[in-house]
Amino acid sequence: MDKPITLITGTRKGIGKFLAEHYVKQEHLVVGCSRSEIDWSLEGYEHYVADVSDEVAVKRLFAEVRKKYGVLDHLINNAGIASMNHCLLTPLATVHKVLDTNVVGTFLFCREAAKLMQKKHYGRIVNFSSAAVPMKLEGEAIYAASKAAVVLLTQVLARELAEFGITVNVVGPTPLETDLTRSVPKEKMARLLSQQAIARLANFEDVANAIDFFLKRESNFVTGQCIYLGGV
């Protein structure tokens, strides 16, 4: 059986890098991208430099994937940026940057991936939202709005792409164990985690487990769904 082709955005570090390693271990051929070069290598992984919000760069990346592999089985839209500012202190440039990366980038990759997946009449797309949406976190108005847009985008795309055998779902992680969260004062983090049914930070494995479910062939009747982790 041919190895599945899995494309993951935002793989330079963090959860994106973890997912690349995770799916290589599962015998996937993984293609990844980020806005800059990576300082690591992995057998079974191929990296491209691309800004997800740059349509020309995105089309060029997919042309390479089409030329080399001919098909695409999975897309994981991990790339995203956050901005934590009170609305009165948020410059317009930040608004554009967050929306371009989180919403426009997700749309462009979904659109181009679906064109490739059509050929096989099969595909799995997993997008990233955030627990900041249901938790309505203060200081994250633009970030939360962008991630809410990803949920609705996912639900509409699920309907539009169902006839092609493509499912589109979304995972919404709670705060992850990262350098950023470790710098947050303990009292503030405790208040945040107390809003979850399971009051702890998420780890990369938690996110991968949810994505694994969406990618399974047996999940062919699951589409347009959002899984928020931690019971928020």
Question: Can you annotate each of these PLM segments?
Answer:
Residues 86-87, 94-99, 181, 192:
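Substrate-binding pocket helix/loop in short-chain dehydrogenase/reductase
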Residues 107, 122, 200-229:
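C-terminal substrate-recognition "lid" of short-chain dehydrogenase/reductases
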